Amino acid sequence: MKLSFTKMQGCANDYIYLDCRESGVPENIAALSQDLSRRHFSIGADGIICICAPVTAGADGRMRIFNADGSEAQMCGNGVRCVAEWLYTHGVAKETLVVDTNSGTKTITRKGRQLWQVEMGGYSAMAAALPAVNMGEGPLVDCPLTVEGRTWRVACISVGNPHCVTVVDDVDSLKLEDIGPAFEKHPNFPERVNTEFVQVVDSTHLKMRVWERGSGETWACGTGTCATVAALTELGVCPAGEDVHVQLRGGELIIRVLPGKKLLVTGSAVTVCEGIAEV
């Protein structure tokens, strides 16, 4: 079977995008995501994002995200910008687009060529929102977490999907392939967790690496960047109401915490290529 696709990336967080607006999501999507995401052997990506017909009145489309291991995710900040860019270049040429996701409806505004700003909605540091267990009810903004014999100070933030944020002295020296899986599968997070390791440069500049559940280390994570800035704002490190620049391996995202604990994220959305895969 031949499968048309578009490969896109936001800060090098790359996905394979499928137009499922009429056909629906393929029945074998989990296996497809595992197969097509393999780097060096297939297209290679962090997963597949299906662009579907909207389910909410007034929305322009819906996205469903499937990680490289075939599991379905709730939300991807980099991915939703790319969905907006794809819709914009495929006949929905509106400066502001509305996209349904598994964590609610998101509004995305075009800020320039291949540049979009997403209204991510609110965040929560309460245990039930992640979920997290054996850590108290929350807010979980400065908690001890023992991982393979070492105790880390973490903040646990939900932005529609669960994140565990920890501050380190030197993010580049970390061996994420060793410690990332232990965080992801920690028993305190029954649905697994995404983990952000952040180095504070100053109050409005951060360096970050991320271990995503279901995908491993990725070069960027929009929701993870939002969770990181939210956590450091709660801790008094970053200022609310100001742009915070976060440098990831794949580029820069700009996050702002608004009144009411709402989040804005601004970043790129770039088409890499289009093609047809034999599946």
Range-by-range predicted roles:
Residues 1-112, 165-279:
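A glycine-rich beta-to-alpha transition motif near the start of alpha/beta enzyme domains, typified by
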Residues 5-7, 153-156:
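Short, flexible, solvent-exposed loop/turn segments with mixed acidic/basic and small polar residues
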Residues 73, 121, 128-133, 167:
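Flexible, glycine/proline-enriched loop segments at strand-loop-helix junctions
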Residues 113-123:
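Membrane helix-loop-helix hairpins that form the core translocation module of multi-pass transporters
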Residues 124-153:
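Active-site glycine-rich loop that binds ribose-phosphate moieties when present
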